[in-house]
């Protein structure tokens, strides 16, 4: 069974120690609630991932574990088969003992867009909200973060993350907790909080921004990446039904509207540092993710539109700083 004792030990003497008052009970309930379904099968696969300490690890320019020279061809084939059990792999890519996990998303491209605008992560404690299988968490560690905590409620993402961590040696201060942000108390402790690809999935985007603020220390940095539309501060797209075949997209604001929301939530130093239209090369089907992807979500006659007729995905990166909060804002 996946356990979180190493995380509890790691934060026991940190500014996150007060989280231990509630976290073990919450994760214990999660474990009890997931005794059935696919999780037991995936955990059996995780228990087979016993490999030597990698001869090379690179988290600064990629997520590369091992050169591919330590394992025999038979061992590589076995490891490939084990990792394929965790399909679909959506966020990556990963290189594991020479095995190239070509994921649906080129998450490294997003990181390249983000990394040059954020405050240096060296010696920072970082929270990644909606972290998926953890690709960006490894890159955050590679950029010098002291501790990286990711939250995402998906059992599959947890197992994908655990697979990578175990093959990497299992000693790195990177942790994925199967939680939604609404399950976190106001920790007021993280130096940097990332929320990338989450806001438009939230029924209440203002509440999400407040939840993100509550995890930051005063002066901490929010890195927010989300879908946007063109328009002024009053422009917000609310899809009538689906957006890009997704039925869980609620609000897509303009950059101006999003910056106004952040100001309303008492962030300061708010700035948009990048706007990028998602390309068919950045999100696509692969051997490791064989389901539909971006090309299937766009109008075949006009890729500037989704199949529903909405503007095609455009993503903005907004950076802001937590101000001293006004406790009258709820």
Curated annotation (Swiss-Prot):
Keyword DNA damage: no
Binding-site residues for carboxy-S-adenosyl-L-methionine, renumbered to this chain: 91, 105, 110, 130, 152-154, 181-182, 196, 200, 315
Catalytic activity of the protein: carboxy-S-adenosyl-L-methionine + 5-hydroxyuridine(34) in tRNA = 5-carboxymethoxyuridine(34) in tRNA + S-adenosyl-L-homocysteine + H(+)
Keywords associated with the record: Transferase, tRNA processing
InterPro entries on file: CmoB, Mo5U34_MeTrfas-like, SAM-dependent_MTases_sf
Biological-process GO terms, alphabetical: tRNA wobble uridine modification
Keyword Amino-acid biosynthesis in record: no
GO terms of molecular function: methyltransferase activity; transferase activity, transferring alkyl or aryl (other than methyl) groups
EC number(s) from the headed UniProt entry: 2.5.1.-
NCBIfam families: PRK15068.1, tRNA 5-methoxyuridine(34)/uridine 5-oxyacetic acid(34) synthase CmoB
Assembly behavior: Homotetramer.
Family designation: Belongs to the class I-like SAM-binding methyltransferase superfamily. CmoB family.
Function: Catalyzes carboxymethyl transfer from carboxy-S-adenosyl-L-methionine (Cx-SAM) to 5-hydroxyuridine (ho5U) to form 5-carboxymethoxyuridine (cmo5U) at position 34 in tRNAs.
UniProt-recorded name of the protein: tRNA U34 carboxymethyltransferase
Source species: Shewanella frigidimarina (strain NCIMB 400)
């Amino acid at each position: 069974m996946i356990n979180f004792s190493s995380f509890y030990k790691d934060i026991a003497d940190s500014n996150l120690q007060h989280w231990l008052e509630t976290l073990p009970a919450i994760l214990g309930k999660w474990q009890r609630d997931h005794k059935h379904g696919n999780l037991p099968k995936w955990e059996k696969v995780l228990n087979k991932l016993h490999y030597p300490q990698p001869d090379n690890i690179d988290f600064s320019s990629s997520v590369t574990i091992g050169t591919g020279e330590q394992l025999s061809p038979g061992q590589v084939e076995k490891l490939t088969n084990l990792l394929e059990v965790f399909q679909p792999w959506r966020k990556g890519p990963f290189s594991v003992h020479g095995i190239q996990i070509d994921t649906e998303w080129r998450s490294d491209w997003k990181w390249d867009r983000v990394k040059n605008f954020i405050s240096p992560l060296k010696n920072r404690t970082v929270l990644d909200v909606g972290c998926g299988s953890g690709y960006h968490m490894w890159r955050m560690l590679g950029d010098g973060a002291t501790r990286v905590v990711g939250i995402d409620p998906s059992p599959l993402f947890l197992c994908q993350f655990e697979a990578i961590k175990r093959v990497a040696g299992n000693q790195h201060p990177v942790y994925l907790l199967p939680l939604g942000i609404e399950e976190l108390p106001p920790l007021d402790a993280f130096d940097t909080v990332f929320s990338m690809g989450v806001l438009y999935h939230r029924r209440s985007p203002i509440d999400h921004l407040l939840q993100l603020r509550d995890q930051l220390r005063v002066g901490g940095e929010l890195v927010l990446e989300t879908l946007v539309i063109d328009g002024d501060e009053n422009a917000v797209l609310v899809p009538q039904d689906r957006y890009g075949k997704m039925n869980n997209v609620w609000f897509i604001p303009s950059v101006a509207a999003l910056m106004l929301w952040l100001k309303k939530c008492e962030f300061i130093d708010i700035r948009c540092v990048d706007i990028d239209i998602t390309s068919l090369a950045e999100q696509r089907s692969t051997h490791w993710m064989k389901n539909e992807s971006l090309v299937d979500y766009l109008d075949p006659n006009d890729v500037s539109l989704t199949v529903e007729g909405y503007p095609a995905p455009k993503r903005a990166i907004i950076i802001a700083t937590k101000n001293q909060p006004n406790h009258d804002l709820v």
